[in-house]
């Protein structure tokens, strides 16, 4: 099936209409629908196939799965629902009088190939993501500003951008690199000692934590959403504030043995 032009961005109805048209030109055993539960009913009515729905975000925030009634209806119609974390699955079953171990439901985590050749690590503390408070960027700035004066050989780096960027007070050795393609991000992580993901918002998954751990970073994360499910090796912040983050980073800086143990897992 050909890739449809980005009709979705101008008209969901037009996109759905074109999708149905293209699907009916062929015969498919299974149709996968990613994050578009509001399209399921019409697809099932007009295209004969089995349907697997992948949910990548909080279902309660999406058209078609916001209410318990909508979620029950969806569960009765599709053949399978795949969740990217247990957290997303739990949100789907919230307020439903059903066992979450439903036979139609399954969790499949995102994965990444672990880098076997870890480059020589440099004294870098890195933040990757949108440079906003939702991602905890202000917490990272405050923590490293207080930290770097005491650890002269270390530097902090931020990779990412933000359209409505707010000016944050940073340390002179905190370098903002801006947007980078994913391949370059992975290379940068491979050279970095410590990665920090201090998100305030409920991350459905948190790919950066997975990528950082796979590249041998000692990784610090918040406990929001599905973030704790992304890696077994990360240090989880009990309190999400600059003081706690500073202390966690500092412990990794001064305790080389602990840092290397976490990096090697």
Indicate residue ranges for each PLM-predicted region.
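Short acidic/histidine- and often glycine-rich active-site loop of Leloir-type glycosyltransferases
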Residues: 167, 224-236
